[in-house]
Each structure stands twice: as C-alpha cells, then as structure tokens.
C-alpha cells in the first residue's frame, strides 16, 4: 500500500506541475509579448539564475516553463519574419543546424513542444498499467526518449525549412529498368549530416527513387509531329491535282507505246499489240486496235484501206438485197429485234436516239438472216453495243470522245459515215459470235456447259460457298445464265464493260492467231493436177504439235477440229474464270444470305460505282485462276 500511495502522490504532483507549467507558460507569454525586445536577454538570464538556486524538481519545472515560453514567443516572431520575407523578396536560405537555435535565442518549434508535452504526459500515465518496479526505471530514463524524439522532429523540421538554391543540378532521366543516376553533379547541397541521415545511408537507393518520383522534372520528348514533311500541309485539291497529273502522264506513256506499234509500220506486231492491250487500250487507239485484235483488220497496213472499202461495200450490198422487194422479210425475227432495241441500255441517252436504234436494228437483222442456224437470240443486242459505241469515237474529235454517250450521231455524221460505222460493227460482231456460236444455237449448249464449268470451278476454289449454295438450294443456272448469255454486260456500266473487252479481245486474239498460224503453215504451193497429190491423212511426225494443244499429239483432222473448238471456246473459257472471280468476290456476303436474298443480290450486284481499277483487279484475279486451273481437267468434270 505504501508503494501505491507513493506512486499516486508522485503522479498527482507531476500532474499539478504540468498544469501549473501550462498556466505559467501562458502568463509568461503574455508578459513577454507586452515587454520590450531589449529586455529579452536579461529576462532570459534572470530565469537561468533563478533556476540554478531552486531545487531540482522546481528547476526542471521552471526550465520547462522557460522553453515553453520561449517557444511560443519565437514561433510567433518567426511567423512574422517569414511573412515579411515573403512579401518583400525571395532570399534563398541554407540548411541550418537546429542544435544552434538556443545559441541564437531560438527555441524548438511548436510542433516539437507539443510532441514533448505529449511524451511527458504519456510518460506519467504509463505507471498505471505497469508494476511498481517499472516506475523507477521509467522515471530514471525519462530524458533519453525525449532526446531521441527531439532528434527525430529536428530532422523533419530541418527538411521543411530547407531551401534549395542550386539550379545546376543535373535532371534525372528515366532509363530502362528505372531511374538513371545523375552524372557527378557540379554542386552539392550545403547540408550538415545528422545522425538520422547517417542511419539512412543503407536505404539511399530506395529513398532516392521514392523522393525523385515526386520532384523529378522530366525533359520534354521531341515533337515528332512537327518534323513531318510538307505533304501533310497539302490541301485536298493539291493532292487531287497531283493524282490527275500522274494519271495523265500514265496515259501519255501508254499512248506513245501504242504509237510505236501502230504508226509507221508495214506489218503490225500483233503479239506485242495483244500483250500491251491486255492492260487497257487508250480511247483514241481503241477502234483500230479492236479491229486488229478481233481479226477484222489485216495486220498489213498497206492492205487495210482496200480491205475496209471492200467489206463496207459488201455490207451495203447485203442491206440492199435484204431490204429489197425481192427478199421476203422474216417478220418474227424483225419483230423480236424491234422489241429488244428500245430496251438496250435504257440508262444511256445514246441508245435512245432513233438514228442509233435504226442502225442497231439493221445490223442485228442482217446478222440473223446470214446465220440461220442460230438466228437472233436475246442477248446479242447487248453484244453489239460495245463495238458500235467504240467505233463511233472515230468520228469525234479527241476532246469530245467522252461525250459519245450523249451526242446524236446524226448531228455530226453523214449517211455514208453511218453506213461505214454499221459495216465495221457488223463484221466485228460476226467475228465475235463465231467464237461463241454454241451459246446461241438451239438449246444453247455452250451456255449450259459454261454454267456447269463455273459450278465445278467454284467448288474447287471456294468449297464453303459451294456448300452454302447446296444447302440453300441455289442453282448456278438461276443467276449465271445471264452472265454467260450477255458476257456480264448487264452487271456493269458501259465504260467498265468496254475496258473489260480490251482484255477479252486480247485473250481471243491469242487463240485466233495461233489457229491462223497453224493453217498458214499447212498451206502448200499450188500444184497442177498432173503432179501426185500428197496424202492428207497421214500419221503426224513425232515433232508435230498443234499450236493450240501443245501437250498432246493428234492427227491433222483432229487438230483442225480441236483447234476450231478451242478457237470457239477461248472467250468462253476465260469468261468462266471472270465469272468465278466475280462470284467469289461476294463470298462473305453471300454466306450470310438465304435463297431469296442470294438470287436478288446476284441479279443486281452493287457494281454501279465500279471503276476501271476494279475491273482490272477482277480480270487479274481471273487470270490467276486460269493460270492455276487451265490445264487441270479435274475441275471441269
């Protein structure tokens, strides 16, 4: 009990001393604030003298009161001084050791006093929860924790009061893997080492990265956007003008290439002409080149004029004989043509002129009369229009060629010129239909064979699309018949059709030339009947090979027959690959459609905005498929 009462008495005395110290601190701060600044040293000395004559307990209490009083006064004084410095001008400061503050009559900061007061208060309350033996130990060692706490808060206060005025420090950079260490700074901070800084040397790397993340000023990255060329500053009009200039230069180069082949030549190299025409023919050269590729105009330039006069005269004579009273008119054929002509290209003004309709009607009727095996079939009226429109540009100035579809030929052509135009169109149409006669004879077996070949080709190229058509019960004949009958003319605009025919006639010319070369090689010089005739039906030699079928040997009779079939199916064969490429182009969309949607889509495909570039891509894809499957007979089975 004695120990407990003694502890209680000590606690009450300390508590009373704390209370009295707070009151004394407030009173002294009031007296000091009212006193003059000149008496401050004497007051400090008097308090120091008095503290030495008092007992130890009272001395410690008085010392605490003095520190509290000095702290409050100096805190207010420093606050006013900092305000004046801020308002007047900025003055960089150096790091100052907090231990020297007592020498300059500066006491610790209020935060330190509050911390010490809290520690003292906590120190006197701790014996309630400890034994009597620990009370003595805590009392004897009460000054040591205060010193450690003072050092801790002094370091923090020192950091807060530091002002860095070294502007030559290198800027840290971010390197791969973390922050890079600055290279040997030219100046260092004038900060004195303390015990806390020495203890934190081991954690320097971690603290440097942590502190630098909040104070680093990263250098700006180079502005790559500003280094762009002047192309980005070009307007849309300038870009379009440059594109037009490039296209014009390309056209001029192509025209010069065709001039080198066609001009000032006695014999035109049809092989070179075919190769260069595959990629498109300039408009000013197209009428002559088409006549050469189709086989209507001879390659010997000296014979061309006489040949044209003879063929045009033959056409005039045929018209006179056909429409004379001596010849009875085929009323059903004439009536069918008369119905189909107004429905030919109704969206083009050229074919709505009466003069054009009369010319097309005469051409088609004369062809039907001269080819009774097939007669007139719907679809031939579409095939005649590319020739008619292309040959019509011969009678227009080069600057008006693009207006051919809106001008009435009767306004700039005489009757004789119109007849010559009809004659050239008639003979070229005849040359074209000779290659696809099977498409228009009874039963149209050529078209049925093409549709079958198309289905088998799509089965090899795109099996998923073929299976989808099978699941939806879509038959190729339901949409591909018109593709074969009109050569895709109703699926494209006339301008793109004419471009497509540049390639078609180039492909056709290759087989026709080969056939002609074969027949010319077989021609023997004329002999009299007295000379023995060389047997015609003999087994060919080992080195003999048909130009159109170089991979197999055959008799001359079979060679002629097969070459004729090859010549007639040449255009059909390439056209099948074009149709396959055209169908596969819409494969992704068709896979999502049912039967009705598929038929509707394929009967009216979205090709209204197609350009010559789109047609060239289609023809290139068709050529690739032909190169892969032309000699593979499995896909035709």
Swiss-Prot record:
Residues forming the Rab-GAP TBC domain are 280-508
Instruction: Quote the biased-composition stretches of kind Basic and acidic residues, using this chain's numbering.
Output: 1-17
GO CC field: cytoplasm; Golgi apparatus; Golgi stack; mitochondrion
Localization, per the record, is: Golgi apparatus, Golgi stack
Task: Name the residue ranges with Low complexity bias.
Answer: 28-45, 128-142, 187-207
Q: Where is this site: Arginine finger?
A: 343
What GO annotations for molecular function exist for this entry?
GTPase activator activity
> According to its UniProt entry, what is the function of this protein?
GTPase-activating protein (GAP) that stimulates specifically the intrinsic GTPase activity of Ypt/Rab-type GTPases YPT1 and YPT7. Functions on the Golgi as a negative regulator of YPT1. Functions on the vacuole as a negative regulator of YPT7. It is also active on SEC4 and YPT51. Provides a catalytic arginine (arginine finger) and glutamine (glutamine finger) in trans to accelerate the GTP hydrolysis rate of the substrate GTPase.
* Polar residues bias: start-end ranges: 18-27, 46-59, 79-91, 98-107, 208-223
Top-level taxon of origin? Eukaryota
This protein's name: GTPase-activating protein GYP1
Q: What else is known?
A: Present with 206 molecules/cell in log phase SD medium.
Q: Where is this region: Disordered?
A: 1-152, 187-233, 543-564
The gene it comes from is: GYP1
Q: Which organism is it from?
A: Saccharomyces cerevisiae (strain ATCC 204508 / S288c) (Baker's yeast)
Pfam families attached here? RabGAP-TBC
Positions bearing Phosphoserine: 69, 250
Residues flagged as site, Glutamin finger: 378
Lineage of the organism? Eukaryota, Fungi, Dikarya, Ascomycota, Saccharomycotina
The answer to whether the entry has keyword Phosphoprotein is yes
Q: What is the effect of changing residue 343 to A/K?
A: Completely abolishes catalytic activity
| One of the GO BP terms on file | vesicle-mediated transport
Keywords from the UniProt entry: Golgi apparatus, GTPase activation, Phosphoprotein
